[in-house]
Amino acid sequence: MKEELIYGRQPVREALKSEKRKVKRLFVMEGAQGKIIEDIKQLSQKRKIPWEIKDKTFLEELVGKNVNHQGVVLLAQPRASLTWQEILKKNKTSPEATVVFVDRVEDPANLGTIARTAAFFGVEGILISKARSAPLNSPVVRASAGGIESIDIAQINNFTQVIKEFQKAGFWIVALEADGDKDIWDADLRGMPLGLVVGGEHEGIRRVVRSSCDMVLRIPSRGVINSLNVAVALGIGIYEVMRQRSTN
């Protein structure tokens, strides 16, 4: 199995904490200090992962001269993913479970921010289309600030078929689109497990995927810009779900 490099203090710490991937070795730049650095060292010792002090040149040769590694690099195997069936089985009995369907998001920064947002709100899982999606590699981990390490992820081939299986299990599937049928705050999102669907940077949600959803909602705009970055839209969407669920 091909190994990956994880870099940045927060991503490295979260990778060590989550134990979702096997780690081979930790490299710490000489002179690197701070609480997170100490946390990283302690976690590596707890997991019996060998670590070495290296100079700046060594780390730059590993990850690239223009990469902000923040003085720590982790050599690890790719993180373990689940199947969509496993994510569904874990959450189908929860009336307030929330999962995210990501349809063809190609920018690693956007996919990483989606994972960070989902982890922040405690979303139960992310289901990502395999076709035309950013790979779950080091830039995605970095953009997620390590959030991708703590959340269940599945990569799926037949996107619409998986949506139908979640619907059969009682999930209500909601697409977020700029031209949605109604404003998100006018929809009742309480009392049911939800799947929120977001689409790629260029085409949005594919028509065949959109037609499979139970609702298509929009985030209302009052300015001259009529659309949001996909990760920002998802964050607002999840927040509205959580807000509604917290009220009677």
Q: Each PLM stretch: what is its role?
A:
Residues 1-89:
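N-terminal positively charged helical leader segments and presequences
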Residues 52, 126-129, 218:
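Short hydrophobic alpha-helical runs that function as membrane-insertion/retention elements
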Residues 142-147, 207-248:
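Structured adenosyl-cofactor binding patch, chiefly the S-adenosyl-L-methionine
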Residues 17, 21, 28, 85, ...:
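RNA substrate-binding interface of SAM-dependent RNA methyltransferases
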Residues 68-72, 142-147, 190-194:
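Short, hinge-like loop/turn segments at secondary-structure boundaries
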Residues 31-32, 57, 131-133, 201-203, ...:
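Short, acidic/turn-prone active-site loops that include or flank metal/cofactor-
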Residues 174-229:
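Active-site/ligand-binding-proximal alpha/beta "capping" segment
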